[in-house]
Structure formats: structure tokens, C-alpha cells
């Protein structure tokens, strides 16, 4: 323990930053390759998919009407089955110099030979009345993902960036 920071003595083969679908897949494949793996996530596992009520466009074996949290729970269990460790922590400093990479948070220091950054994306809520209440129930942040749910409905696109226009 160094100044309130716990040094994790283990040097992992791989540390994955992010426990969304990409991070969990990376952890799964690294674990299946018999590498020591640590998956670090600062928030809720799953990223944006964790707030999705129903998934219909994800490749693979999806249970009819499966929710984002359900799919992420299965993905997490699969990564852990192959040896990936999962820790909730917020990394505040990263040093990718040298053979051993160092990742620091307010409470711990982690080391790995390789780092995979899979921190994902996040939506930018606009803060209008009812937005939080109806997210996933009519308010969507991914037109490509959710367009099928809104067929034959009048929709509004809010945003001025490229993705708002393209979607």
C-alpha cells in the first residue's frame, strides 16, 4: 500500500479497459488464448447496450426479446469462464511506455504487458423533460439500432452532428 493506493503485484498479460461488448469479447478471446486478463470498467457493464430494452440486431444466439442487461450478463459470464477477472475501477492515469504498462486509479495500480482500449461511446442527452424517463421506451440514441421499432411512426431527430444527419 503506497499512499492509499494498492499496488496489484500481478502483471497481467492483458488489461482491457471497458466492459461493453467489445471489451468483453476481447477479454473472452484473450482468456481462451490462456492469457491472464483483467477487465476494468468504471461504470455499469455493457455500456450503451446495458440500457437497451430489447435486442434484435445482434449477431449470434439471442433469446427472443432479450434485453441489453441480460445479454451483457451472459457475455460477462462467458469471459469469466475463460479466466478473465473483472474489477470496477476508474483509471485516471495510463503509462504505455516500456514493456510493462501501468494503469492507475485513486485506489490501485495495475500492470500489464498489453492494454486493449475498448471504452466505447456514449450518448449525449439533451436534458429535455421526459428524456430520462422514456430512454429505451421511445427515446433512442441509435437510429440504426432502433429504426425497426419506429416503422410507421413520426420521429424527430435531434442533433446537428454527422451521425444525426446520416442516421
What is the predicted function of each stretch?
Residues 44-46:
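Helix N-cap at the beta1-alpha1 junction of Rossmann-like dinucleotide-binding domains, i.e.
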Residues 115, 119-142:
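Glycine-rich beta-alpha-beta "Rossmann" dinucleotide-binding loop(s) and their flanking helix/strand
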